[in-house]
A protein has these predicted regions:
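Class I (Rossmann-like) S-adenosyl-L-methionine-dependent methyltransferase catalytic domain
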Residues: 1-74, 100, 108-165
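Short acidic/histidine-rich motifs immediately flanking catalytic phosphotransfer sites
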Residues: 76-78
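A conserved beta-strand element that flanks and buttresses the S-adenosyl-L-methionine
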Residues: 80-84
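A short, conserved alpha-helix within the catalytic core of class I
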Residues: 88-100
Length: 165
């Protein structure tokens, strides 16, 4: 059996904001959010980072990045944002990364995970895709049980959760 990749192979270059970031931006604007953010697992979502900058200072972090400044582990920030990060990690790694993420978030966090069907070969609690990457699709109940918080938006493709400590 081939090894499952949980690295940058899942990153996407986007020409527009990700769907969860569009919704999060509306939420932050409505609530007049002003914060110091960590964009956890930024990947190639530079437009998402630029959108967060409308609401405060942003420190991108991604251990798989080709840019040195985004690979360096950050100091804690008021608010953490992780979009499509945790659904790419198998259970043990996901647990460790979630703990690290929540420890970096002093006041609040927002997490978006996939909830659409994902084709692949069953592997642990998700699937191995044809690209050799791990992906997990969450039900609303699973997402709330694993991450906590409250549902900000649920669509056919993603669930956006948030918590204000």
């Amino acid at each position: 059996m081939n090894a499952v990749t949980t690295s940058g192979k899942t990153q996407r270059v986007r020409n527009e904001l990700s769907a969860p970031m569009r919704e999060l931006s509306k939420f932050l604007e409505y609530n007049e959010w002003d914060s110091d953010f960590i964009h956890f697992g930024e990947g190639k979502a530079y437009l998402d980072t630029m959108e967060l900058e409308k609401f405060g200072k942003v420190r991108p972090y991604d251990p798989n990045s080709s840019e040195e400044h985004t690979r360096t582990f950050p100091t804690p920030r008021s608010t953490g944002v992780a979009i499509y990060v945790f659904n790419t990690l198998p259970p043990l790694k996901r647990e460790r990364v979630l703990l690290a993420f929540k420890n970096l978030c002093l006041d609040s966090w927002f997490i978006a995970v996939r909830c659409d069907p994902i084709a692949g070969t069953p592997h642990e609690d998700g699937v191995t895709t044809s690209r050799g990457t791990f992906q997990k699709s969450y039900s609303e109940k699973e997402a709330l049980a694993e991450f906590g918080g409250k549902v900000i938006k649920k669509t056919r493709g993603y669930i956006l959760l948030g918590v204000d400590k």
